């Protein structure tokens, strides 16, 4: 029995957020075995580099590397074509869920309109998310969000969009 289940069966489910460079498949397996109690793990984001999906990222989400875990792979992309390419990998690996990262503040990525660097541009966010959902309607999409890149209220401009899209959730 996991330590959390013994505390209270009526508690909310726990979702394990990723930390780039730390919470890889080995960490997730060890955490699940030692602590348990996590309903869903999220992978660090999968991204494209030099026109290809990074091999390290693809290995990390391999189902064989994540046995007995409910893993939702996360991706980061500045446009719908790259996003679709990454989502196709998720589908190929058997995943039916994807988390789209609009929260990463890492300057090298954000300056290229990845992660929260896209938040000041609501039309780009709309194009990215709408295309993702239209192109992959069988994938349950969610969004990882930050308040903003330049201003905390940037996320508020996106609220109408989020309300009209069939997102599984926003974190």
Model-predicted segments: where are they?
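Short, hinge-like loop/turn segments at secondary-structure boundaries
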Residues: 57-62, 116-118, 158-160
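Conserved radical SAM core fold
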Residues: 47-50, 77-80, 103-116, 171
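Alpha/beta enzyme core
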Residues: 30, 87-98, 102, 106-108, ...
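A generic structural signal for alpha->beta connector loops
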Residues: 11-13, 37-38, 67-70, 138-140, ...
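Gly/Ser/Thr-rich beta-alpha loop segments that engage phosphate groups in nucleotides
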Residues: 19, 23, 105, 117, ...
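Glycine-rich, positively charged N-terminal anion/phosphate-binding segment
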Residues: 8, 19-92
């Amino acid at each position: 029995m996991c330590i959390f289940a013994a505390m209270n069966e009526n508690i909310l489910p726990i979702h394990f957020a990723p930390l780039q460079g730390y919470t890889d498949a080995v960490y997730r397996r060890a955490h699940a075995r030692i602590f348990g109690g996590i309903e869903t793990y999220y992978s660090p984001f999968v991204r494209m580099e030099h026109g290809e999906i990074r091999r390290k990222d693809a290995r990390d989400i391999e189902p064989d590397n994540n046995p007995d875990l409910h893993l939702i792979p996360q991706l980061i992309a500045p446009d719908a074509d790259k996003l679709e390419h990454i989502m196709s990998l998720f589908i190929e690996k058997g995943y039916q869920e994807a988390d789209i990262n609009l929260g990463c503040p890492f300057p090298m990525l954000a300056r290229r309109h990845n992660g929260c660097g896209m938040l000041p541009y609501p039309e780009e966010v709309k194009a990215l998310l709408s295309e993702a959902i239209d192109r992959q309607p069988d994938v349950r999409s969610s969004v990882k969000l930050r308040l903003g890149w330049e201003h905390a209220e940037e996320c508020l401009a996106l609220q109408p969009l989020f309300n009209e899209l069939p997102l599984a959730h926003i974190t």
